[in-house]
UniProtKB/Swiss-Prot annotation:
Biased composition (Polar residues): 1-13
Domain Cyclin N-terminal as annotated: residue spans: 186-284
Family from the record: Belongs to the cyclin family.
SUPFAM superfamilies the UniProt entry points to: Cyclin-like
Presence of keyword tRNA processing: no
Protein name, UniProt field: Cyclin-Y
Organism per entry: Caenorhabditis elegans
Amino acid sequence: MGNSSCCLRTRSSSGEDKSYNNDGQYIRTNQVEFQYVNQVFPRDETSTNFLPHISEREVTEGYEEDPSTNPTARPTFMERSKSEMKLKDNRRSCYMLDALAAGGHHPGILPRSLRKSSSCSTIYIDDSTVSQPHLKNTIKCISLAIYYHISNRKNRGHERLMEIFEERLHPIFRDPIPPEQMTRDPDHRNIYRFVRNLFSSAQLTAECAIITLVYIERLLNYAEMDLCPSNWRRVVLGSIMLASKVWDDQAVWNVDYCQILRDTNVDDMNELERRFLECLDFNIEVPSSVYAKYYFDLRTLALANDLQLPIQPLYKERAQRLEALSRVFEDKIQSSSLPKRARSAEHLVFEHPAVLS
C-alpha cells in the first residue's frame, strides 16, 4: 500500500531513559524500548483508471473470517470480553441463589435480582432499535468494547504498533501525558468521556458509533496491530473521523475536530485519516448484515454489564411511535436510493419571449 511503519516493543535491561525522537526511530522510557521499523508494502503497478470497485474486489486471503466484513464471524470485542462476561454471569447466579435462600429475611433482594420476561400477552422492550439506537447507551457499549480490546490484548508486552497512531510521537493534548499512563490500561470511564466529547461536539449519531467500532476492528485486523494505552485515542479519533464522513455523510471537516481537540492541527488530522484509509485498503463498506450483527452483540455486551436501558411494556401508542421512528429512517434510505426521474424532450416546456406587434 505504500510506505508505512510499525513498532516492536521489547523490555529493556538498563534503567536509563531516553527522550523522544521526532523521526520516530527509537524511543525508550520507563525501561521499555520502542523501536520503529519502517516497512514498504508492495504497490500494484496499475493505473487508477483500472482500479476495481469495492464490490468487485476479491477477498484477500486470511480476511474471510474478518468480523468487520463477514456477518457470520463473531466480533473481536465479544471474544475479548468472553471471560469477563462468564465471570459476571457466575457472580450473578451466586447472587440470585443467595437471594433465593434469604428471600424470607430480605424481601427486597429477590425482586431486584429477577428480570422481566416477555410473554404472549405482554412484551417488554426498550427505546433502542436497530435503525435508531439509543445514543448514550451505544457510546457506553462502544467504550466498553474498546476497553476490552485494550485490557485483553493478546500481545501484552510485545505489542505491534504503528507510528502514526502513537500518542508519544503525535500527541493530541498539549499537556504531557505521564509515562505511567502510556503503559497502564485506561479505565472504561476515561474512554467513555473521550468518545462522548467527540460525539456531542460533532453532533454525531448512534449509528456512527457502531460504524466506528467496525472500523476499529477492521484496522486491527488489516494492519495486524494491537490497541494499547499509547495509541487508543488516535485510533478512535481516526475511526470517528472516517465514520462521520462515510456513514452520516455530514459536512464534517477535519478542522472541526481541531476545534474540539484544540491542541491538534489540520495537517496531523489529514495524515491520520490518510494512513487510516491506507491501512483499511480503502475498504470502507459496511454491509447492513454486519451493522446489525454489531448492534445486537453490543446489546448482549450491555446486558452482561448491566448497561441495558430500562424496559417497559409495549402498548399501542408506544408501538406506533417506534414504528414511526423506523419508518422515517426507512423512507430516508429509500428516497436516497431511488433514481431521479428524467423528462423526455416531448414534454419539455420552453418559454419564448413574446413579440408584440
